[in-house]
């Protein structure tokens, strides 16, 4: 298991299929199927974020940090979240993840990201990972493409799924 379906595979596939559909290229009919898969994966990702802002650390490329949530961020940016997931709960969940991971040691003395998952942990970096690879974590910022008055930004804070579930909420 790893997060490569979120880092690049599913997001890039939907982007390519979108262009294919726009230009009526053969195979573009797969767009609708893939879009439903992307939305389902975003739904699963939202539930993976614990009340504390942690999530399973698994697979390779752990140094990409919260870039693991590219699918959730992209589906939010596309405004295609499932009905039961509100944009504000995604905003709050992703913010909690970032606050949890951006601890002392995350940045070097010049302000560049250090290798690691939570702080400076070069030993977790795969041999193909460089300092530049760290910046795949910026995928989490895709919602910055939304307008400032978008519900994602303006709605009051809302608990995300695992917070509700672990508190015994029935909502």
Task: Go through each PLM region and give its residues.
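Long, repeat-rich segments with strong aromatic
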Residues: 2-115, 122-149
């Amino acid at each position: 298991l790893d997060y490569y379906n979120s880092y690049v595979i599913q997001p890039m596939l939907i982007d390519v299929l979108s262009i294919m559909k726009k230009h009526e290229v053969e195979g573009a009919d797969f767009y609708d199927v893939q879009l439903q898969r992307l939305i389902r994966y975003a739904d699963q990702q939202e539930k993976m974020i614990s009340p504390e802002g942690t999530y399973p650390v698994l697979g390779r490329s752990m140094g990409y940090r919260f870039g693991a949530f590219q699918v959730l961020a992209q589906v939010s940016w596309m405004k295609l979240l499932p009905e039961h997931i509100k944009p504000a709960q995604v905003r709050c969940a992703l913010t909690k993840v970032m606050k949890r991971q951006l601890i002392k040691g995350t940045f070097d003395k010049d302000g560049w990201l250090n290798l690691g998952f939570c702080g400076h942990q070069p030993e977790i970096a795969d041999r193909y990972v460089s300092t530049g690879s760290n910046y795949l974590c910026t995928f989490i910022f895709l919602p910055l493409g939304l307008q400032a008055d978008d519900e994602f930004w303006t709605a009051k804070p809302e608990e995300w799924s695992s917070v509700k579930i672990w508190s015994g909420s029935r909502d």
